[in-house]
């Protein structure tokens, strides 16, 4: 390959001289076996699994939901989420706030005990008292990062009903978003 320096620091590949790095793009998701498609959005092409029930997509969605910038639930790593989803403790976001129903099962899981469970429950309790921008960001809405969520909430004065009724055109008209 030939490489050049882009933006002062970041190396950028200019050319693949041997063409040895050609990959066959899969048309099937390696996790669930569902159809995989390339979707172009804002001049960027990305490969997506089209199965809405894909386990990998669910785990990534839950991982974003509990992340530091979102609901900030410490103790729910991607691996722990996989375990809890596999055990049936979590099926939707709201289930995270009712993990106390599974206390006896959770404390017997490998890597968990009373202390880990209590720390997790404290973190879940703190997440109940978060801000609306964090909740909106945590939902994983395309093109709505934390800063856009903050701008939307500011525009609509944290009125969830007004935000829910807003059209795509109205949201795009907000300064800094469109």
Locations of regions flagged by a protein language model:
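Duplex nucleic acid-engaging cores and interfaces of nucleic-acid transaction enzymes
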Residues: 1-2, 29
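Short, surface-exposed secondary-structure boundary micro-motifs
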Residues: 3-7
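Accessory alpha-helical DNA-binding modules that contact the DNA backbone or grooves
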Residues: 8-178
């Amino acid at each position: 390959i030939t490489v050049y320096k882009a933006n002062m620091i970041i190396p950028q590949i200019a050319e693949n001289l041997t063409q040895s790095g050609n990959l066959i793009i899969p048309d099937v998701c390696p996790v669930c076996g569902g159809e995989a498609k390339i979707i172009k959005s804002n001049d960027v092409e990305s490969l997506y699994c089209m199965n809405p029930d894909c386990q990998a997509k669910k785990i990534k969605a839950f991982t974003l939901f509990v992340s530091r910038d979102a609901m900030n639930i410490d103790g729910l790593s991607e691996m722990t989420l996989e375990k809890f989803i596999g055990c049936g403790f979590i099926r939707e976001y709201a289930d995270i706030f009712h993990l106390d129903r599974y206390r006896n099962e959770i404390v017997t899981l490998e890597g968990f005990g009373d202390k880990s469970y209590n720390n997790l429950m404290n973190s879940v309790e703190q997440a109940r008292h978060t801000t609306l921008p964090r909740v909106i960001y945590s939902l994983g809405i395309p093109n709505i990062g934390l800063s856009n969520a903050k701008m939307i909430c500011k525009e609509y004065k944290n009125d969830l009903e007004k935000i829910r009724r807003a059209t795509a055109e109205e949201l795009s008209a907000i300064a800094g978003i469109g």
